[in-house]
UniProtKB/Swiss-Prot annotation:
GO terms for molecular function: ribosomal large subunit binding. PANTHER family: MITOCHONDRIAL RIBOSOME RECYCLING FACTOR PSEUDO 1, RIBOSOME RECYCLING FACTOR. The lineage of its organism: Bacteria, Pseudomonadati, Campylobacterota, Epsilonproteobacteria, Campylobacterales. Keywords: Cytoplasm, Protein biosynthesis. This is Ribosome-recycling factor.
Amino acid sequence: MLNEIFNKQKTQSEKSLEALKKDFTTLRTGKINTHILDHITVDYYGNQTPLNQVATVLASDASTISITPWEKPLLKTIESAIAAANIGVNPNNDGESVKLFFPPMTREQREENVKQAKAMGEKAKVSIRNIRKDANDAVKKLEKDKAISEDEAKKAYDEVQKLTDVYTTKIDESVKSKESELLKV
């Protein structure tokens, strides 16, 4: 019973940590990453389709992304979807592909991204605390139903807190690591 609660807490906490790392990929660092375009969708035969499912998206160098659609008529659609996404660059259509040239980041942009990373970390910590609350509620219910003793419940609460501390530390480390990556010129 208790192991199920702990395993569920671990699984959910791991998902929160993975979600944080996925969120971090949307932040621009000194070196350009194609994940910055992951949230962009284009109209493809009436359906909103992720950009990477209708085109090849490559980082040609540290500051340029090249998007080559699999069907030429999509060039204009891709260009307007990127312009509408407001990612800080203007798309450049050369007739074959859409190129995005990212200027070097300013100190202010880097600091703004650090703020966003910290906010993402805080959101992940809130998620971890909610997971802890759910686990504690499950232990409390077992204790109330007399399925476990008061001593077992106390040990279970301690274990839930230990897991919470472990994942909170992992989140702090991830945020610190991302912060140093963002500030590196």
